[in-house]
A protein has these predicted regions:
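Core structural elements
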Residues: 148, 171, 463, 655-668, ...
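Conserved phosphate-binding loops in nucleotide/dinucleotide-binding enzymes
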Residues: 210, 323-326, 526-535, 555, ...
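N-terminal, positively charged nucleic-acid-binding surface of large information/translation enzymes
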Residues: 3-254, 260, 324-337, 341-356, ...
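C-terminal low-complexity, glycine/proline- and small-hydrophobic-enriched intrinsically disordered tails
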Residues: 651, 779-916
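Short cysteine-rich clusters marking metal-coordination/redox-active sites
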Residues: 195, 401, 480, 518-524, ...
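NTP-handling and nucleic-acid-processing catalytic cores
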Residues: 20, 24-37, 154, 166-349, ...
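Catalytic adenosine-cofactor/nucleotide-binding cores of aminoacyl-tRNA synthetases and other
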Residues: 400-404, 451, 567, 599-604, ...
Length: 916
């Protein structure tokens, strides 16, 4: 009888791995089916029920904008939130996650205007326009909700918060009123970022910096009493008509030159080099001697008062700053000190208005009236004549409107502000002081977020919260027509909020003052008028802590939230607006920790754009790879910096996914007949070794996950799976798993170790690869399921503390040295399999293992301390101990293929015993 035939005969006697868990995930096809099941099973509600009475974790969702489809940055954000929520859930905590959407604001209003046309918009009733905006937002809420669910994100999708819901609008308004009650809401004329393309004021968070070419000019203002001209420098010639002052630095020296110019002494050499001036220094001037004197604006002959200000720097320019209080924050502040006129000759569309005629700001006003200010630059330079000493066009970073991407202007208008530097509340501190104190006590992931937020809070101006648009929550106050005073009566404000809650804030536009006014106010509706501005959308989103976490309108978790998590741009956006609104209204911080992630970029680290063709769309990734690969990409990325994504990177994550899936499949298949996990004390040295390794690694993974360093944890997991588990342990266990008796303690011990590791792998990866771990449980034997219906019933698995008696260094070194000899023998065709070999050693670390363990470690037929008489095929030493490799002298067992049979074509004693 041939051996081949015997092998075929004995194959049925082997305990080969058994599982129906597929090798391939077929994720794009199978995930949607699974997500549909989760929806039908209401797993979010199930998760709530499973953790009743447990410690809670609340991650408050920052609202994406309800306009357009989601992009890869949205996917990153929502997946990271989902992983963190599920991590805490599988750690045994009760989680709440109410998703939300930002529904008001300019982009939606612009989309509606594009659809109906600007002319129709002008004649459309405001409430009708607002309804069209509401419909547009609702459409994209539904679209984005579906897209987010496809990412495997579990949330309270049936009860999201929408900033346009009536109750929500009412609570935004209540937050505004609470801030007014604290005395921090002020209305004044002040320069603000102004988008002339969108005809509205902008907050700091709505300003983006882009490159722009501007004329850099030096202009001579002749002093009224000194025979010299002061040279100012500016890159905004269009603001020169509104100039009412020239700022000098009172702590610096100035000089007069032989060509009759006055400049800062520190900048004299630079001005000579740049050929702005040519003369030598003839006199040193104390700037305080020039204070409150006048120079003459060469553009219109109007006086320009010389003032002293700390904002005048000596790093560029001339040391004399052109000052137009209507066009700049510093200009405005210094203007208040010196009583400079605030002239604003520019209308909402960025064009010169009738002010230039009334104030005689140009010699020939007709050619400037109605002209866009940026188009006026060249005309102004021409009109300056000899007073223009130098012009150079420069490319520099300039503020642009975040929505229209047009350069903005500073424009003094009457706006509503939240004061940052007025004292208020119990502690009588400013909002800035309170915010900075809070930041010191928050937890930041990563830590550098603290300094970034602090720097922005330290340098920020008052918060301009008013907008001159239609789609938003109105700043709904009544103003006395005669006195111009705002009615801040609490009952009047509460009544307005009640109407908003019942009818929405469209009521402000649809109802008469007599209907909106609290009946018992004692005020005459005829004496009142409505304010017309709406709130900045950042105020909307900043109010979510009140409208969602504190209103009891949502089952949204605890206040303050445990975590806010958004992109790093939100240090100047939502993190700030949430902090400032909450502190201003109730002097409490809205969150305990802040986690920020970077932006998504392509493989080369470049920003994604349609023109470059490097955009990675989430729906394309889902169709090609599945959401599990996208989730693994998020978890494997260092989110603290920008995250690279490309087809190549996704393929790498697919490979990692396959490793995890196939390792899990192997574990599943080999514990299919295990009925009970044996105690650790009955396990062999190799089983204890791998459990000890697993315990250490999974503890490190858990610590990394608790610090939200998922990539660090997954790299440790990958290394363990590849090197220790698949690379060594699973390989060395195959003989006992397949060939030992079903009830042999060696086999049961290995199965038990594998079952414990499999359970830990499932609970560890459940937050990240939720679909795959749920699928795995479907096919898992009861020993792994623990009576769970699905992954959401799964509880945290804690591996036992195991002491390994193995000297890992010796075993691994010996295995590596033996591997080198084995490879050489295979290459020279001396052997086909390592089972043809036996090893002699006098190493007590190796001999301490029993015969089965030691031979399995090297995958040879035998390890002995008896010297052999045959030829040595190779040898090495570890710690002075000898290892010699020989050909096995026994015969090949036709069942296990080990060379341990006494006679040819007969079973070895182990296999013979098993088959009995």
């Amino acid at each position: 009888m041939k051996i081949e035939g015997v092998i075929m005969d004995y194959k049925e006697s082997l305990l080969l791995p058994k599982t129906d868990f597929p090798m391939r995930g077929n994720l794009p096809q199978n995930e949607p089916i699974k997500y549909k099941q989760w929806d039908e099973q209401k797993v979010y509600e199930k998760m709530k029920q499973n953790r009743v009475g447990c410690e809670s974790f609340t991650l408050h969702d920052g609202p994406p904008y309800a306009n357009g489809n989601i992009h890869i940055g949205h996917a990153l954000n929502k997946i990271l939130k989902d992983i963190i929520n599920k991590f805490h859930y599988f750690e045994g905590k009760s989680i709440r996650y109410v998703p939300g959407w930002d529904c008001h604001g300019l982009p939606i209003e612009q989309k509606v205007e594009e659809k109906i046309g600007s002319e129709k918009k002008k004649i459309l009733p405001k409430s009708k326009l607002r309804q069209l905006c509401r419909d547009h937002a609702a459409k994209f809420v539904d679209i984005q909700r579906t897209e987010f669910k496809q990412l495997g994100v579990i949330a309270d999708w049936e009860n999201p918060y929408l900033t346009m819901d009536f109750k929500f609008e009412a609570n935004i308004y209540r937050e505004l009123c609470a801030i007014a009650k604290q005395g921090l809401l002020i209305q004044r004329s002040k320069p603000v970022y102004w988008s002339w393309a969108a005809q509205t004021a902008l907050a700091e968070a709505e300003v983006e910096y882009e490159d722009k070419t501007s004329p850099s000019i030096y202009v001579a203002f002749k002093h009224e009493s000194i025979d010299a001209s002061i040279i100012i420098w500016t890159t905004t010639p269009w603001t020169l008509p509104a100039n009412t002052g020239i700022s000098l630095n009172g702590e610096e020296e100035y000089v007069k030159t032989s060509d009759k110019f006055i400049v800062a002494k520190k900048l004299y050499n630079a001005l000579i080099e740049n050929e702005v001036i040519k003369g030598e220094i003839v006199e040193t001037i104390n700037p305080k001697d020039l204070e409150n004197t006048n120079a003459i604006n060469p553009l219109n002959g109007r006086p320009s008062k010389i003032v002293l200000g700390e904002h005048v720097m000596m790093d560029s320019g001339s040391g004399a700053v052109h000052t137009a209080p209507g066009h700049g924050e510093d200009d405005y502040k210094i203007g208040l000190v010196y009583g400079l006129d605030v002239i604003m000759p520019v209308d909402a569309f960025g064009k010169y208005d009738e002010t230039i005629v009334r104030e005689k700001l140009f010699r020939d006003t007709e050619k400037y009236l109605g002209l866009n200010v940026f188009k006026a630059n060249d005309l102004i330079l021409e009109e300056l004549g000899d007073a223009l000493l130098k012009r150079v066009d420069i490319r520099h970073s300039y503020p642009h409107c975040w929505r229209t991407h047009t350069p903005i202007i500073f424009r003094a208008t009457k706006q509503w502000f939240i004061s940052i530097d007025d004292a208020y509340g119990k502690e009588n501190k400013t909002l800035r002081e309170n915010a900075l104190n809070v930041v010191e006590n928050l937890t930041f992931y990563p830590e550098w977020g603290r300094n970034r937020l602090k720097a922005m809070l330290e340098g920020r101006p008052d918060w301009c919260i008013s907008r001159q648009r239609d789609w938003g929550v109105p700043i709904a106050f009544f103003r006395n027509k005669k006195t111009d005073e705002i009615v801040f009566d609490e009952k009047v404000l509460n009544y307005t909020a009640m109407i908003f809650e019942q009818f929405g804030c469209d009521a402000w536009y649809d109802m008469e003052i007599s209907e909106l006014l609290y009946p018992g106010s004692g005020l005459n509706p005829d004496d009142l008028e409505k304010t017309t501005d709406i709130l900045d959308v950042w105020f909307d989103s900043g109010s979510t802590q009140n409208a969602v976490l504190r209103s009891r309108n949502y089952d949204a978790g605890t206040f303050p939230a445990d975590m806010y998590l958004e992109g790093s741009d939100q240090h100047r956006g939502w993190f700030q607006s949430s902090l400032l609104t909450t502190l201003a209204s109730s002097e409490i911080a809205p969150y305990k920790s802040i986690l920020t992630h970077g932006f998504t970029v392509d493989e080369k680290g470049e920003k994604m754009s349609k023109s470059k063709g490097n955009v990675v769309a989430p729906d394309k990734v889902l169709k090609e790879y599945g959401s599990e690969i996208l989730r693994l990409w998020v978890a494997m990325s260092d989110y603290q910096s920008d995250l690279k994504i490309s087809d190549n990177i996704l393929k790498q994550n697919s490979e990692l996914y396959r490793k995890i899936r196939n390792t899990a499949r192997f574990l599943l298949a080999n514990v299919s007949d295990l009925e009970e996990i044996v105690s650790v004390d009955k396990m062999g040295p190799l089983d204890k070794w791998v459990l000890s390794k697993a315990k250490k690694v999974f503890d490190e993974i858990e610590a990394a996950f608790y610090a939200y360093e998922f990539s660090k944890g997954l790299n440790k997991l990958n290394n363990f799976l590849v090197v220790d588990l698949s690379g060594i342990y699973l390989d060395v266990c195959k003989d006992r798993l397949y060939c030992d008796d079903k009830k042999d303690i060696h086999r049961l011990a290995s199965q038990s170790a594998m079952a414990l590791i499999a359970k830990k792998l499932i609970s560890t990866m459940a937050p990240i690869l939720t679909y795959t771990m749920d699928e795995l449980l479907e096919f898992a034997p009861e020993i792994l399921k623990d009576c769970c219906d699905d992954i959401f019933d799964y509880k945290k698995v804690v591996l036992p503390e195991v002491e390994s008696a193995i000297d890992e260094t010796v075993l691994l070194s010996a295995k590596e040295k033996f591997s080198e000899i084995k490879d050489s023998l295979s290459k020279e065709k001396v052997i086909k399999s390592t089972l043809e070999l036996i090893i002699y050693t006098n190493s007590q670390e190796i001999l301490a293992l029993d015969e089965v363990e030691s031979s399995d470690w090297f995958l040879v037929s035998s390890v002995t301390n008896n010297k052999q008489n045959s030829d040595i095929l190779g040898s090495f030493q570890i710690d002075g101990k000898d290892f010699e490799v020989y050909k096995a002298s026994a015969h090949k067992c036709p069942r296990c293929w080990k060379f341990t049979a006494v006679k040819e074509e007969t079973l070895c004693s182990r296999c013979e015993k098993v088959l009995e």
